[in-house]
């Protein structure tokens, strides 16, 4: 009799949970339509892979790319709609979140054609690779729209787990295994630190998990200036710092960049920073509204360390991927300036604009590295000497992307940095902007050093890798060139395109 009653209660509880989930999906599902497209694409990939043979491989690329493009289209159609909170307060839809989701989708869309030839040459498992890319993209999109502490913790874990698997995708490579181990251990530690900070925030607010409700809870409990909030701020900053990889939370970055497959590095180098930046702006600006002076100071220290250490250590590197790893540490220091400035002086708009240009500059550079690596099998900067004599198109593309990363006019990187530094100067961050300007000049040195090698024509400096280089024709079926051309064009956009981009970015208030 007791078992019968317990069984009936279990069935009733299960039915209530199912009906509640169905109700949420029915009424709130339209607000996550772009994410649903990616989920449908994931299911379709699994179905095709389990029922087809090797001849259907092009369909896997087509489905992945189409899912991403359709998701971008759905986001664009939803632009300028009223902000909405759905799924019982777990998810928020507004222009600010959507523009970061657009950037993540753009990164993934460009990374897939960049990876095709690499996967074919290295004989990597295609379906799993595409599944991890789409799942990581999905996690990043949910992180951008996360509105409570649980979702903010679960969404990046979804992204991180896929990142660990992708970084160790070449299991026979010792460097890849080492990079994955370090990445996994440090990622697990940072997640523990982050959730510990969330627990302090949860307790101080009286048990609230939604971001805006946490602010109300802190006011009601009079805990907004308590030591507990300071402890929460420190732990959360350290946890988010792992995702952004500013100094001194950058130890995993060079090893992961060097040991992971190059298309994976290209994907992680931009998507992780975009998603973490979106999350950081909301966490610091909403729950820590009353501690703005404290988190401004913390981020200023991180920005200064990142800009100085990243650019100084990049000068000494001999590996192209390690050089870009330290360069990315310096670049995130510039992005942090926009986060500190905030919405009052156009900081978020300048950060979003620079992030858009950074995506094109960085992915364009990695597209060139993938192409060169497949034809020579080397990643050493010295082995790029004389590339212009063998493949002028590739050499010029790499040179333009590097010059744009350095911020030389009239390339896109110059105008992105100019607007970012100008907003910081207007906000009174004179010392921070001065450090940014000096380190930008410093970064030009090691970028120009590589460009000088590319353009050299002296036979004694050209290594056997370039002498035996198999040139890829300009008009070929090579999908890497598609991503490369798009990124190079976007990296060289003149300043005339800045105004409409900034106007769109300024329309992202939350």
From Swiss-Prot:
Top-level EC class as recorded in UniProt: translocase
Tagged with keyword Nucleotidyltransferase: no
GO cellular component: chloroplast thylakoid membrane
Single GO MF annotation: quinone binding
One protein family per Pfam: Proton_antipo_M
Subcellular location: Plastid, Chloroplast thylakoid membrane
Keywords: Chloroplast, Membrane, NAD, NADP, Plastid, Plastoquinone, Quinone, Thylakoid, Translocase, Transmembrane, Transmembrane helix, Transport
Keyword Transmembrane helix: yes
GO biological process: ATP synthesis coupled electron transport; photosynthesis, light reaction
Membrane-crossing residue ranges in chain numbering: 24-44, 57-77, 99-119, 124-144, 149-169, 183-203, 227-247, 295-315, 323-343, 354-374, 395-415, 418-438, 484-504
Protein origin, superkingdom: Eukaryota
Catalysis: reaction(s): a plastoquinone + NADH + (n+1) H(+)(in) = a plastoquinol + NAD(+) + n H(+)(out); a plastoquinone + NADPH + (n+1) H(+)(in) = a plastoquinol + NADP(+) + n H(+)(out)
Disulfide bonds: none
This enzyme's EC code(s): 7.1.1.-
Function of the molecule: NDH shuttles electrons from NAD(P)H:plastoquinone, via FMN and iron-sulfur (Fe-S) centers, to quinones in the photosynthetic chain and possibly in a chloroplast respiratory chain. The immediate electron acceptor for the enzyme in this species is believed to be plastoquinone. Couples the redox reaction to proton translocation, and thus conserves the redox energy in a proton gradient.
HAMAP family linked to this entry: NDH1_NuoN_1
Family named by the database record: Belongs to the complex I subunit 2 family.
Quaternary context: NDH is composed of at least 16 different subunits, 5 of which are encoded in the nucleus.
Protein known as: NAD(P)H-quinone oxidoreductase subunit 2 A, chloroplastic
Lineage of source species: Eukaryota, Viridiplantae, Streptophyta, Embryophyta, Tracheophyta
């Amino acid at each position: 009799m007791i078992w019968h009653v317990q069984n009936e209660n279990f069935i009733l509880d299960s039915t209530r949970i199912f009906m509640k989930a169905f109700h949420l999906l029915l009424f709130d599902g339209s607000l996550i339509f772009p994410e649903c497209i990616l989920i449908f694409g994931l299911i379709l990939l699994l179905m095709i892979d389990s029922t087809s043979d090797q001849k259907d491989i092009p369909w896997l690329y087509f489905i992945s790319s189409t899912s991403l493009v359709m998701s971008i289209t759905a986001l664009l159609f939803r632009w300028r709609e009223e902000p909405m909170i759905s799924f019982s307060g777990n998810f928020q839809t507004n222009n600010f979140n959507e523009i970061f989701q657009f950037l993540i989708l753009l990164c993934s869309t460009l990374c897939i054609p960049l990876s095709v030839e690499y996967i074919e040459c290295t004989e990597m498992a295609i379906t799993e690779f595409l599944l991890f890319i789409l799942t990581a993209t999905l996690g990043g999109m949910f992180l951008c729209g996360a509105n409570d502490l649980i979702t903010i913790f679960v969404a990046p874990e979804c992204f991180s787990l896929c990142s660990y698997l992708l970084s160790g995708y070449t299991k026979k490579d010792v460097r890849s295994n080492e990079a994955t181990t370090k990445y996994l251990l440090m990622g697990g530690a940072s997640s523990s630190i982050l959730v510990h900070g969330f627990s302090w925030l949860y307790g101080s607010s009286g048990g609230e998990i939604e971001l805006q409700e946490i602010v109300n809870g802190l006011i009601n409990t009079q805990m907004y200036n308590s030591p507990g909030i300071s402890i929460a701020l420190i732990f959360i900053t350290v946890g988010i710092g792992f995702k952004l990889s500013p100094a001194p939370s950058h130890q995993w970055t060079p090893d992961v960049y060097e040991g992971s497959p190059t298309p994976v590095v290209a994907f992680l180098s931009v998507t992780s920073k975009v998603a973490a930046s979106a999350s950081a702006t909301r966490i610091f600006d909403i729950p820590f509204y009353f501690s703005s002076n404290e988190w401004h100071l913390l981020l200023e220290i991180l920005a200064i360390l990142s800009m100085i250490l990243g650019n100084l250590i990049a000068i000494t590197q001999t590996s192209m991927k390690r050089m870009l790893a330290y360069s990315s540490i310096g670049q995130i220091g510039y992005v942090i300036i926009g986060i500190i400035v905030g919405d009052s002086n156009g900081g978020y708009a300048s950060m979003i604009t620079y992030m858009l240009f950074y995506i094109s500059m960085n992915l364009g550079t990695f597209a060139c590295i993938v192409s060169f690596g497949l034809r020579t099998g080397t990643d050493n900067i010295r082995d790029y000497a004389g590339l212009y004599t063998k493949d002028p198109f590739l050499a010029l593309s790499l040179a333009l992307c590097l010059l744009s990363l350095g911020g030389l006019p009239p390339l896109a990187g110059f105008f992105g940095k100019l607007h970012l530094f100008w907003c910081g100067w207007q906000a009174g961050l004179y010392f921070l902007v001065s450090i940014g300007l000096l380190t930008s000049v410093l970064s030009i040195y090691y970028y120009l050093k590589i460009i000088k090698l590319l353009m050299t024509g002296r036979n004694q400096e050209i290594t056997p890798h370039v002498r035996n280089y198999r040139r890829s024709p300009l008009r070929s079926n090579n999908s890497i060139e598609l991503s490369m051309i798009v990124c190079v064009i976007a990296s060289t956009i003149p300043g005339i395109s800045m105004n409409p981009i900034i106007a769109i970015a300024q329309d992202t208030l939350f």
